[in-house]
Amino acid sequence: MEWDSGSDLSADDASSLADDEEGGLFPGGGPIPYPVGNLLHTAPCGFVVTDAVEPDQPIIYVNTVFEMVTGYRAEEVLGGNCRFLQCRGPFAKRRHPLVDSMVVSEIRKCIDEGIEFQGELLNFRKDGSPLMNRLRLTPIYGDDDTITHIIGIQFFIETDIDLGPVLGSSTKEKSIDGIYSALAAGERNVSRGMCGLFQLSDEVVSMKILSRLTPRDVASVSSVCRRLYVLTKNEDLWRRVCQNAWGSETTRVLETVPGAKRLGWGRLARELTTLEAAAWRKLSVGGSVEPSRCNFSACAVGNRVVLFGGEGVNMQPMNDTFVLDLNSDYPEWQHVKVSSPPPGRWGHTLTCVNGSNLVVFGGCGQQGLLNDVFVLNLDAKPPTWREISGLAPPLPRSWHSSCTLDGTKLIVSGGCADSGVLLSDTFLLDLSIEKPVWREIPAAWTPPSRLGHTLSVYGGRKILMFGGLAKSGPLKFRSSDVFTMDLSEEEPCWRCVTGSGMPGAGNPGGVAPPPRLDHVAVNLPGGRILIFGGSVAGLHSASQLYLLDPTEDKPTWRILNIPGRPPRFAWGHGTCVVGGTRAIVLGGQTGEEWMLSELHELSLASYLT
């Protein structure tokens, strides 16, 4: 994240800020919660900010003085913990034995208890030379009295300790005195360093600078000074930030969710970024879906859950449509009378395109596997299914995966063909044109054939494939592999992000989900993917949630511990995402898909619970 330091304030400006009783940086007014006086030494101070919300409290900002004194550039240390300064040089893996462990323990204690720390600790420059760090750590509290950031002010002092040469070091950094003398007078004065930014109008700062930052960065920038704090309280700015970071379609969907306006864009951005308000709850709804069935497909249209088809008694394919309106005070399943329904089927996909249009593809019918396409406008009067006769269709299949691109294009991948043959192809159908034509997406290399996997869209035109029942030679096995493809490229190709010995596969940090199929994949704002449920072997819990951000340089799996009552079972074909902020899991606690009067809801924002 990018921060702008307040450490260039002149003495008069700093005193004015510290004495202003109307507040400035933080809610409720009052003095600035970190010692401005410490920034006014004759010699400049290092200034470091860490994110107390994230695991291991990563560094999110260092000022120029820190870089010049320690020899570490900002890009080398951002995202890491400050403890690297206790190691002698960039190649050292352990804390140096001369570093006082009692002081380190006291620092940890103060951070854990949320209190300020003051003391001295031996640190090392990048070249391995020692210096004493007169350190002051101050916790910063958010609106809900939780610690959001920790500010560290560092006054570095030369120390005469002969430690000998540093292994792997080929150069010697300048001494601290030389660095201080090299600093121009203007660089020591914060107000001069920031005047270029503050000469801009509020409109330019908000619309041309702040709106282009990520939600995390905007939250960080708000702590720089009073003016930026006030600017970042504007709801229109936060909406623009969310739109730029998450896309217009996601923003539009979020606007339709009940309660979003009451929560506000600033709070919504925070909760959907940190997932701090995510919670499970169990719901009971009225109505019924008769006859009972399994292996149906569910999809969300706005705040409505739509269920189509399924496998009835004696493997009877179904072709009826049911709707559950979650906007209702008392939601209940209602049978929708539609004209010209498709042939009955199960193992198909049901996908939403163009707002209120539903697309059915494939599945297993009375006469075998299908590769037909039907579209239903749920808001039409009366609703009528119509068949789309796309040219050059894919092979008939079931238990494939599908997703939508740009709101108009259907993408179909894999599945099971005749005689149990697993497929590895990927097709695209543009439903916005009058006579759609199926187009296979060619790739020099494709992931192993599979069924029961998921496709997720992120970053505009990128798709991510996860899991499924994959084929390797004569063997079929549950998979936890991750593959991505960028469809904006001239020649799209599959890339293996993580995998079990796949070509070019990486080894992600964290704990990867156990291999599975027919699981749930939830697209989160910003490109992150949430995985849970499905068919998992062994004693692993299917209700455990796993988070992956494929946009990171080194994607890392993270386990999420969400409060509430999660379902013991969740199936991909029976789960849908409503409004971009709620995952609705159909079926009872014991996994019986036909118990559709019981739902489990994963809410990602507090206004939904």
From Swiss-Prot:
Ranges for domain PAS: 32-114
Residues of the F-box domain: 195-241
One GO-annotated biological process of the protein: rhythmic process
Keyword Flavoprotein: yes
Residue positions where S-4a-FMN cysteine is found in the record: 82
Kelch repeats mapped onto the chain: 292-342, 345-392, 397-445, 450-501, 516-564
Keywords, ordered alphabetically: Biological rhythms, Chromophore, Cytoplasm, Flavoprotein, Flowering, FMN, Kelch repeat, Nucleus, Photoreceptor protein, Receptor, Repeat, Sensory transduction, Ubl conjugation, Ubl conjugation pathway
Impact reported for residue 203 to K: In ztl-22; long-period phenotype and loss of binding to NFXL2, but no effect on binding to GI or PHYB
Effect of residue 46 to E: Loss of binding to GI
Tissues and organs where the protein is expressed, per its UniProt entry: Ubiquitously expressed with higher levels in cotyledons and leaves.
Consequence when changing residue 213 to A: No SCF(ADO1) complex formation and reduced cyclic degradation of ADO1, but no effect on binding to GI
Phenotype for residue 372 to N: In ztl-26; long-period phenotype, but no effect on binding to PHYB
Induction: Not regulated at the transcript level, but circadian-regulation at the protein level with a peak at the end of the subjective day.
Maturation and modification: May be ubiquitinated. Degraded in a proteasome-dependent manner.
This protein's GO CC annotations: cytoplasm; nucleus
Residue intervals of the PAC domain: 118-161
Recorded metabolic or biological pathway in which this protein acts: Protein modification; protein ubiquitination
Biased composition (Low complexity): 1-17
GO molecular function: photoreceptor activity
Major site of localization recorded for this protein: nucleus
NCBIfam families linked to this entry: sensory_box
The family this protein is said to belong to: Belongs to the ADAGIO family.
Miscellaneous section: 'Zeitlupe' means slow motion in German.
Record function comment: Component of an E3 ubiquitin ligase complex that plays a central role in blue light-dependent circadian cycles. Acts as a blue light photoreceptor, due to the presence of FMN, that mediates light-regulated protein degradation of critical clock components by targeting them to the proteasome complex. The SCF(ADO1) E3 ubiquitin ligase complex is involved in the regulation of circadian clock-dependent processes including the transition to flowering time, hypocotyl elongation, cotyledons and leaf movement rhythms.
Oligomeric form and interacting partners: Interacts with NFXL2. Interacts (via N-terminus) with GI and (via Kelch repeats) with ADO3. Component of an E3 ubiquitin ligase SCF(ADO1) complex composed of SKP1A/ASK1 (or SKP1B/ASK2), CUL1, RBX1 and ADO1. Also interacts with SKP1D/ASK4, SKP1K/ASK11, CRY1, PHYB, APRR1 and APRR5, and probably with SKP1N/ASK14 and SKP1S/ASK19.
Protein name per the record: Adagio protein 1
Organism: Arabidopsis thaliana
